[in-house]
Amino acid sequence: MAHVGAVVAAMAGLMAILLHSSIHKIEEGHLAVYYRGGALLTSPNGPGYHIMLPFITSYRSVQTTLQTDEIKNVPCGTSGGVMIYFDRIEVVNMLIPTSVVDIVRNYTADYDKTLIFNKIHHELNQFCSVHTLQEVYIELFDIIDENLKTALQKDLNCMAPGLTIQAVRVTKPKIPEAIRRNYELMEAEKTRLLITVQTQKVVEKEAETERKKAIIEAQKVAQVAEIQFQQKVMEKETEKKISEIEDAAFLAREKARADAEYYTAAKFAEANTLKLTPEYLQLMKYQAIAANSKIYFGQDIPNMFVDSSASRPAAGESEQLESLSMRESLKKASKPKASEGH
């Protein structure tokens, strides 16, 4: 009985070992590919628990979601002979589930070492060998990751369809310490130069602003002066027009006064012409003689009151009296003008 119990226990232990070796679990986002006697089977299994023949069949889990492969400490020689090292390069890739069996058959389950790691080393060395340290470290560093991604994807499209590269991230390479210090000094000088240039631009901008401000002020002063000049010109023109109007009015008044005086004199002369009859002239003669207070001596004094029409022609006497009357009239007419002058 003891022997039977030992056999049963041994068989139970063997069955437990066989079950433990045959049952396996596949995580989500992975596929299991199986090898039987070293040959790859064409039927992979998805996530979950699965059973296989122990000791005869083996499996490998292959990730089919996004994964990041890291390549560290990649050496690279520039065209100038300087050896630099890229500390870390990250490649984000994804394998399509339908292409898992073909890629594993052609490149094993560690396909990333063949298709990604080796290709990164090759492409990076190709890039460095045709560029200087200045270009690799500074000028062209921003395009290295894109160039690597493009070159990788181009080769994978031919060699392993179904494996896609999503992104490539490259860290700054390590360069010799002496060269690094020189670059740091150079960058510091560039920074100082940039600050100087920017300061100069600011000063030039301020000077340009001041110049424009001065031009604007000068233009404003010129415009104000022009407006004031135009205002003065208009004032002078207005004064000139007012003076012309006043002169015209004065001339019109003087002309009207002269016309009135001329008309008055003409009418007075016409009235005198009508008034100077022989009888009136005779009366004026006697009045003038009577009003004369001067004393005359001579033999002809009595004859002054005698009608001398017989001895003198009537025409001559009439002319003398008319001239005398005209002189008296002119004296009377000149008296108002003299008073106006005062």
Curated annotation (Swiss-Prot):
Topology of this chain in the membrane: Single-pass type II membrane protein
GO terms for biological process, alphabetical: cholesterol metabolic process; SREBP signaling pathway
Keyword annotations from UniProtKB, A to Z: Cholesterol metabolism, Endoplasmic reticulum, Glycoprotein, Lipid metabolism, Lipid-binding, Membrane, Signal-anchor, Steroid metabolism, Sterol metabolism, Transmembrane, Transmembrane helix
Residues annotated as glycosylated: 106
Keyword 4Fe-4S: no
Highest taxon listed in the record's lineage: Eukaryota
Segments crossing the lipid bilayer: 7-23
UniProt GO molecular function: cholesterol binding; ubiquitin protein ligase binding
One GO CC term on file: endoplasmic reticulum membrane
Segments for region (Disordered): 308-342
InterPro entries in UniProt: Band_7 (IPR001107), Band_7/SPFH_dom_sf (IPR036013), Erlin1/2 (IPR033294)
One Pfam assignment: Band_7
Cytoplasmic-facing ranges: 1-6
Subcellular location field: Endoplasmic reticulum membrane
Family affiliation: Belongs to the band 7/mec-2 family.
Record's function text: Mediates the endoplasmic reticulum-associated degradation (ERAD) of inositol 1,4,5-trisphosphate receptors (IP3Rs). Involved in regulation of cellular cholesterol homeostasis by regulation the SREBP signaling pathway. Binds cholesterol and may promote ER retention of the SCAP-SREBF complex.
Protein name: Erlin-1
Organism of derivation: Danio rerio (Zebrafish)
